[in-house]
Amino acid sequence: VSLSSPTLYPLVSCEGALTDGNLVAMGCLARDFLPSSVTFSWSFKNNSEISSRTVRTFPVVKRGDKYMATSQVLVPSKDVLQGTEEYLVCKVQHSNSNRDLRVSFPVDSELPPNVSVFIPPRDSFSGSGTRKSRLICQATGFSPKQISVSWLRDGQKVESGVLTKPVEAETKGAGPATFSISSMLTITESDWLSQSLYTCRVDHRGIFFDKNVSMSSECSTTPSPGIQVFPIAPSFADTFLSKSARLICLVTDLTTYGSLNISWASHNGKALDTHMNITESHPNATFSAMGEASVCAEDWESGEQFTCTVTHADLPFPLKHTISKSREVAKHPPAVYVLPPAREQLVLRESATVTCLVKGFSPADVFVQWQQRGQPLSSDKYVTSAPAPEPQAPGLYFTHSTLTVTEEDWNSGETFTCVVGHEALPHMVTERTVDKSTEGEVGAEEEGFENLWTTASTFIVLFLLSLFYSTTVTLFKVK
């Protein structure tokens, strides 16, 4: 009897919409195999195994002179919607060969994104040095979830200062599943006042959706698209330094604020103490407001969900947005390098710039601080770039921070320490110290190499002279 390997086919349930309240049934059909013994198993996209409790394998059925069998797995749609999974992997073991098959999740319907950009209020620029604020781009109501967001300034792609959050499932009841994504771009006040044109470009299913904004947009008479809500997750720096997580719910495009209420609640419905702050009226006659609440850092790090609820007389029903710490991003600790000032700069005897290079970390949230003789320096003493993707390492990021000190401080032997905080580090923080002696070590190595070469050269010359002398004496003796 000849052996026959199974041929695999994907099976997807056609019943019901992909919503938070039901299960997604995925199936795998194996046909035309011989002998009849076959074993099914399932795994996620990242190769983690699916519990056998959710897997059901049906009896083998004879079809002609060969056999067929099916396996079914039930996955909570909530996990599917809030994760990054695009497919499951059906694995079939057979005596003749092992086969794998990708089974993609169903897409109820194809819906384009609604793209909006929040313009920063004039008083939102802050910083003792270069004053900065953020543009926020949000794409909502789209399906399927595959999407990308990029920023342009005056038609040129912006690579730095961009922070894009993972795609999230929108909270809703019945109906097709839709998703949302938000991206933030850090801008300087001088660039904003220079009338630069910023574009948020959303690529969904190969179609571009552009939204342009500039300072002149503040004076636009275009009607407001309606109240917008942007939940902002706490940064790692705030969580690590304060040991608490600050949740921010930003509400924009308010025509009035008398009936506004912003509240935060934990996953079990327990209300959190929420402080609400309302800005002054913007040039387009709208208001913005923020609702802030603090929770324990441990609760945030554990992945607990928190919901912001906004009510207003202009809203037909409350707007709710849920956030939690993303777990899908792979963690990778940073490598930290501290570089002393360049000799060319020290020759000028004006200032000394120390650089801290932080490479190869994930997720992108990181903080960098500087210390002098163990004491923290004010943030206006140094400049840290926004995390940017590593060109040769997809999924990893890098940043650098430059500290400028006086030439006198550097030459006097002052020590400067770069402190880096990141959630993937063993103790959440690491540091590297540099001083004039570090520069000396580099110089000493170079000087030692030069001295070694000089000594070696001398020995080589003496050896050649002695060899020449010996040869000459030998010739005279022969004669």
Swiss-Prot record:
For the region CH3, give the residue spans.
223-327
Superkingdom of this protein's organism: Eukaryota
Q: According to the UniProt record, which cysteines are disulfide-bonded?
A: C28-C90, C137-C200, C249-C308, C356-C418
Membrane-crossing residue ranges in chain numbering: 459-476
Protein's cellular compartments = Cell membrane
Span list, region CH2: 107-222
Q: Which InterPro entries match?
A: Ig-like_dom (IPR007110), Ig-like_dom_sf (IPR036179), Ig-like_fold (IPR013783), Ig/MHC_CS (IPR003006), Ig_C1-set (IPR003597), Immune_Resp_Modulators (IPR050380), Immunoglobulin_dom (IPR013151)
Q: Which GO terms describe its molecular function?
A: immunoglobulin receptor binding
**Gene3D superfamilies xref list:** Immunoglobulins
Give the record's glycosylation annotations as residue positions.
N46, N114, N212, N261, N277, N284
Q: Where is this region: CH4?
A: 328-458
Name the Pfam families on file: C1-set (PF07654), ig (PF00047)
The annotated topology with respect to the bilayer is: Single-pass membrane protein
* A cellular component term, taken from the record's GO annotations: plasma membrane
Q: Tell me the keywords, alphabetical order.
A: Cell membrane, Disulfide bond, Glycoprotein, Immunoglobulin domain, Membrane, Transmembrane, Transmembrane helix
Q: Where is this region: CH1?
A: 1-106
**UniProt keyword Membrane present:** yes
Q: What protein does this entry describe?
A: Ig mu chain C region membrane-bound form
